[in-house]
């Protein structure tokens, strides 16, 4: 895993403001107005570890005994995994390697609680992901897109093995493109309830959607063939 130094990151997003125009709304009437509001905030980042690559099919299958994807190449990222699958994998990997479990996970209620003082594997936060992706770079990407990423314009409509493109300054591969990556955070709980954040773009994504600051969202039990994940680990004193 790669050591990520402390620092600060500025996050920005455009959120939907939904307001009822009339309390006498009936189905079929134009009762909702949506306005995009820019939200900007800064987050301090403590040092942590982040995986050099997204979790591969080989590693995922070895740890879980399950095969969710339809690919057969061991070095390709695991796909067709939900946020809940990713959280469960983190705990299983922690146990396999002798670390404490970072998550308390209830399969029945699907509730997840973090044990912040443990050294187990976890998903990166939204802020950690962007900070690590940019790696001191200033632009939307840390390099030319064809040099660093598999996206719709060069992927031939398929997933590729990890590590084939150039890494960023901190030695992280495929932070942009190939697969979207699950992050820990809720997107906007008030509006979207339990939707979780995905980052980075994918092999199927247009160029404009593949960047360090691009943020999307999805349900925690959703899975598809261009979403995977990357693991992190806290540095516990």
Where are these regions (language model features)?
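Short non-domain terminal segments
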Residues: 1, 25, 46, 58, ...
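A short glycine-rich, aromatic-capped structural motif
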Residues: 1-69, 74-94, 176-177
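Short loop segments at secondary-structure junctions
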Residues: 7, 201-203, 234-237
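Functional-site microenvironments in short loops/helix caps that host divalent-cation chemistry
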Residues: 10, 18, 72, 83-216, ...
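Residue-level detector of short, conserved catalytic/binding motifs and their immediate flanks
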Residues: 41, 48, 76, 121, ...
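Short, structured beta-strand segments at or near domain termini in extracellular proteins/domains
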Residues: 225-237
């Amino acid at each position: 895993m790669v050591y990520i130094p402390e620092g600060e990151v500025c996050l920005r997003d455009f959120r939907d403001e939904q307001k009822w125009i009339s309390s006498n709304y009936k189905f079929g009437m134009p009762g909702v107005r949506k306005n995009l509001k820019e939200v900007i905030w800064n987050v301090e980042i403590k040092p942590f570890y982040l995986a050099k690559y997204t979790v591969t099919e080989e590693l995922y299958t070895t740890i879980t005994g399950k095969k969710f994807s339809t690919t057969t190449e061991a070095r390709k990222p695991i796909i067709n995994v939900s946020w809940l699958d990713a959280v469960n994998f983190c705990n299983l990997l922690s146990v396999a390697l002798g670390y404490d479990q970072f998550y308390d996970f209830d399969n029945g209620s699907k509730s997840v609680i973090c044990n912040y003082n443990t050294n187990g594997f976890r998903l990166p936060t939204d802020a950690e992901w962007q900070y690590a992706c940019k790696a001191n770079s200033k632009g939307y990407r840390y390099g030319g897109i064809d040099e660093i990423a598999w996206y719709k314009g060069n992927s031939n409509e398929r997933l590729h093995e990890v590590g084939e493109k150039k890494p960023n300054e901190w030695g992280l591969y495929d932070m942009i493109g190939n697969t979207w990556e699950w992050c820990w955070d809720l997107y906007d709980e008030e509006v979207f309830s339990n939707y979780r954040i995905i980052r980075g773009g994918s092999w199927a994504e247009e160029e404009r959607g593949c960047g360090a600051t691009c943020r999307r969202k999805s349900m925690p039990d959703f899975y598809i063939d261009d979403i995977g994940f990357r693991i992190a680990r806290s540095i516990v004193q």
